[in-house]
Regions:
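Contiguous, well-folded functional domains in the mature portion of proteins
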Residues: 1-135
């Protein structure tokens, strides 16, 4: 499901695929292989209500047959299913401009400690910075 709200009547881009391997995606493996650079990836660019331009990137992983995205260009809304991973799970990376988002402190601290954090769909990860909400 799409984790952020896109601007009304602003279409997301088509899906872009980047060929790559299917290494396991976990903190230990990332010490040996740069999975976010080497694994198969698919991404979409969009304009969001509170964060400005953003990218959602799905990262393929070991035991993931492929990435399936339903929509090409078009209007999306928060909570809509954008696609899924066939067989198994993987990782989704959200990219924002640094001045637009404030990540929750508990996630930053766990990251500094090298800990993986399991998250649930819909769980808050951060919020738009105040100046971002006003622009």
């Amino acid at each position: 499901a799409l984790p952020i709200s896109v601007k009304t009547n602003e279409p997301k881009s088509r899906n872009y695929f980047i060929k790559g391997a299917y290494h396991t995606v976990n903190p230990t493996a990332n010490n040996y292989v740069s999975v976010y650079k080497e694994n198969a990836r698919e991404f979409t660019m969009m304009k969001t209500e509170h964060f400005g331009d953003a990218v959602q990137m799905e990262v393929g992983a070991l035991m993931v047959g492929r990435i399936v995205n339903h929509h090409e260009e078009g209007i999306m809304h928060r909570g809509m299913e954008k696609g899924y991973f066939e067989f198994g799970g993987s990782t989704i990376v959200l990219l924002f401009r640094g001045d637009k988002v404030e990540i929750d402190e508990c996630l930053l601290e766990r990251t500094k400690d090298g800990c993986e954090t399991k998250l649930k769909q819909g769980q808050r990860l951060g919020m738009a910075k105040k100046q971002s909400l006003q622009s």
